[in-house]
């Protein structure tokens, strides 16, 4: 099998779609301008290996997606990252196998759409928090099913038969120094890969920093490897006490860029729709404010450090099963594809060795870096303190950036957290879609009955009351989140259709 390429300068620069006809032997790739395309492989990503060899399918740390094919082989291998934050999406129709790193691209190309009477999309898209073995692998459409491929190498034959091969990367980690050295070595190789002269685009380096553990530790690791630009929110009031300016200065960063966490609300480009289409109903859209800074860059983040670096994560496992679903999706792939940004969550590098990382975190050598309490992460604390940052300067109160729409009770209540352009678009969409009203109201009633404790506890928190009631462990997509995802996907499909 062999690749044939068609560049489309109008689609997001890192997006691609592969089309395989039954028994044809040709894999047609439609791709954006910065997808790296060669005879035997194509890739939108970076890894800890030599770029020209294209061996990202066996990498210890791959960030992005791509495909590998040999002309004398009867199958092609499509590759996902060594974590669950990105997926590949496929479907078979009319004796053709279609696969893409963009769900809206796949739907726009195939002519399919989401089902407006299905309310589980938030759960399905964010089930990555349940790990590689428990996550949802099929996405219901109006008249079809999309397969979601995560944390695997996907082999597809010329007869359109496919099989997922689970990732199998392993490293041995016994001590803190083992972990620190392997992380630094892996990051160095990734950065070398990203700056290879044979690439169409050599990527810059940008990190995020705050007074929390995860972003600070990530920034401590990448500074010595050439990263000198750090982003942080310093306003409005919510972010003042979490500003990472002081931490960045102590770590040695020279180019420190401060932003306003609410500046995204001035956008007219439907950033919220772009984010929602991937299942992220809030959380990361605030970072879009910095998009021109991290354009054409590797963007280092501290996402999932609360689990991978958490001292009390006794259920640590190799499958990235975070046991319970987060209220924040922590993924924004459509934005990164458009902006030619490769997001790298530093805690997820070697994250498949979570059990070993947990043992190191709780070992005797780390005791002096444990400060006690619920917010206690010895590994990131040691990484930062060894760079000369005083203990009292960070890691004592969890703030977190962003927000979530999912607990908003009404469409009108979303308005205060969304740009006017996006809100008006969402409002118009909500009026245009046709839904089974009886089914909708039944779902809404069930949702609020099940999640009453969550809303009650929120009110108690606002009243500064210590009284709480136990919340349900059963996750259920919120009605507002479901609407946001439908709207976001509809807008992104329109964007792709216009481009193709």
Model segments located where?
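Cysteine-centered catalytic environments shared across enzyme families
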Residues: 1-263
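Membrane-proximal basic amphipathic "stem/tether" segments
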Residues: 1-28, 428-500
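Charge-dense polyanion-binding interfaces
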Residues: 101-121, 128-131, 371-391, 425-429
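Short coil/turn segments at secondary-structure boundaries
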Residues: 142-144, 370-372, 396-398
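ATP-dependent adenylate-handling active sites, centered on carboxylate activation for C-N bond formation
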Residues: 158, 165, 169-387, 391, ...
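PAPS-dependent sulfotransferase catalytic core
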Residues: 313-314, 333, 391-462
């Amino acid at each position: 099998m062999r690749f044939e390429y068609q560049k489309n300068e109008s689609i997001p620069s890192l997006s691609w779609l592969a089309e395989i006809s039954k028994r044809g032997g040709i894999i047609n790739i439609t791709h954006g301008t910065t997808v790296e395309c060669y005879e035997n492989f194509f890739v939108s990503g970076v890894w800890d290996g030599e770029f020209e060899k294209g061996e990202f399918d066996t990498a210890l740390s791959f960030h992005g997606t791509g495909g590998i094919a040999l002309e004398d082989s009867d199958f092609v291998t499509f590759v996902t990252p060594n974590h669950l934050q990105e997926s590949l999406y496929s479907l078979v129709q009319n004796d053709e196998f279609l696969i893409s790193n963009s769900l809206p691209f796949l739907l726009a190309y195939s002519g399919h759409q989401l089902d407006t009477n299905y309310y589980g999309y938030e759960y399905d898209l964010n089930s990555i928090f349940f790990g590689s073995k428990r996550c949802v692998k099929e996405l219901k459409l109006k008249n079809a099913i999309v397969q979601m491929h995560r944390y695997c190498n996907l082999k597809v034959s010329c007869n359109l038969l496919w099989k997922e091969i689970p990732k199998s990367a392993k490293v041995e980690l016994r001590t803190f120094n083992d972990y620190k050295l392997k992380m630094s070595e892996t990051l160095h190789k990734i950065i070398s890969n990203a700056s290879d002269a044979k690439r169409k685009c050599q990527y810059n380096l940008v990190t995020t920093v705050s007074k929390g553990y995860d972003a600070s530790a990530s920034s401590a690791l990448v500074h010595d490897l050439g990263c000198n630009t750090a982003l942080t929110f310093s306003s409005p009031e919510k972010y003042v006490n979490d500003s990472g300016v002081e931490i960045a200065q102590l770590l040695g960063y020279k180019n420190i860029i401060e932003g306003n966490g609410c500046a995204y609300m001035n956008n007219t480009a439907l950033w919220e729709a772009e984010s929602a289409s991937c299942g992220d109903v809030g959380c990361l859209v605030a970072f879009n404010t910095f998009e021109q800074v991290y354009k054409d860059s590797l963007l280092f983040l501290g996402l999932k450090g609360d689990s991978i670096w958490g001292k009390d994560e006794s259920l640590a496992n190799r499958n990235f099963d975070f046991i319970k679903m987060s209220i924040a999706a922590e993924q924004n792939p459509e934005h990164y594809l458009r902006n030619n940004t490769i997001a790298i969550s530093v805690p997820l590098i070697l994250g498949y060795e979570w059990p070993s990382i947990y043992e190191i975190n709780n070992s005797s050598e780390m005791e002096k870096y444990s400060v006690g309490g619920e917010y206690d992460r010895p590994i990131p604390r040691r990484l930062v303190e060894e760079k000369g940052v005083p203990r009292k300067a960070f890691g004592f109160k969890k703030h977190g950036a962003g927000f979530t729409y999912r607990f908003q009770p009404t469409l009108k209540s979303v308005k205060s957290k969304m740009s006017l352009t996006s809100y008006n678009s969402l409002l118009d969409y909500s009026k245009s879609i046709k839904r089974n009203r009886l089914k909708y109201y039944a779902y809404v009633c069930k949702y609020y009955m099940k999640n009453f404790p969550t809303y009650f506890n929120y009110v108690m928190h606002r009243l500064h009351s210590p009284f709480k009631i136990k919340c349900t462990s059963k996750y259920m997509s919120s009605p507002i989140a479901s609407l946001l995802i439908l709207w976001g996907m509809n807008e992104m499909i329109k964007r792709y259709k216009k481009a193709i």
